[in-house]
A protein has these predicted regions:
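Phosphate/dinucleotide-binding and metal-coordinating scaffold of catalytic cores
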Residues: 1-105
């Protein structure tokens, strides 16, 4: 299992988790859920105490990256990631995503 800490506008909001099987999850941390100013990172993943699983998680994080396969392959080559899938690429470049989201190992 591997995980990335997810930040939004500098606030630690949760973890993006990938299991050895390839299954992915996202879970909000307790401090963020209980903050009066907390908002979800996506309307498709509301603030809950349960883990978000499946396509909704994969699609959200995958959409932080370029769609173009060649661009993903260049990122993979430059950073030496195992694959050009979202979790692997975001492990290397997630600190500099578009928008308010950052991912850190």
């Amino acid at each position: 299992m591997a995980d990335l800490f997810v930040f939004m506008n500098g606030h630690d909001v949760g973890k993006y988790i990938q299991h050895r099987s390839g299954a992915q999850e996202f879970v909000y941390n307790d401090l963020w859920q209980n903050a009066e100013y907390a908002i979800p990172i996506s309307l498709s993943m509301p603030l809950t105490e349960t883990k978000h699983k499946g396509d909704v998680v994969y699609n959200f994080f995958d959409n932080l990256l370029p769609d173009n396969k060649e661009t993903r392959q260049r990122i993979q080559s430059k950073f030496g990631t195992k694959t050009n899938q979202a979790f692997d690429l975001l492990t290397s470049i997630g600190q500099d995503c578009v928008g308010a989201i950052q991912l850190l190992p």
